[in-house]
């Protein structure tokens, strides 16, 4: 029994090492540019070992995306509770979720760079709905969170709910995440421009909130 437990622990550690090696390479270059052979070398194992864990590159990419967003969501939940959680009104929750994207830019630019490349890769590879299900479940929790905020706004009136829910989601959190991703990749400023664009995201947050927050006069 002890050997079985040890084997399982070693397999889990090796799998995690392969995923982290892939993440480093994907974030530094792009998903398309990195081969499985390079990932195996980065992880310090042979390619045959890698194939024991991941039959195809999309398998590795999707599991990696699923794991990274689940880890980030756990961070968001912890910060959400520290900020007041469900005691916040809808406007305060929207402020929090925009701040969570800013924190993602500050602390996890590698995830933003990976994410910017992920969608194009899985479309190009024609990944099936079955393959994508774990990933979609991992990221859909953010949309469910927004749905809760929108319902709260309907009740407390602190956000402009004359804007349909999906439209508001796409044009606030989704758009904000997209801009943060472009900043992380250095796409919106020249290479010799500012390296930390947190202030630009804070400005954009103020613009977004100014357009949708409703306070009693």
Please identify what each model-predicted range represents.
Residues 11-23, 39, 64-68, 72, ...:
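Generic hydrophobic, amphipathic alpha-helix propensity
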Residues 92, 137-139, 155-173, 199:
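All-alpha amphipathic helical-bundle segments outside canonical DNA-binding/catalytic cores
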Residues 103-147, 166-167:
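Short secondary-structure transition hinges
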Residues 1-13, 80, 216-217:
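N-terminal intrinsically disordered/low-complexity leader segments
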Residues 17, 25-63, 67:
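Helix-turn-helix
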Residues 63, 78-110, 165-172:
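Hydrophobic alpha-helical connector segments
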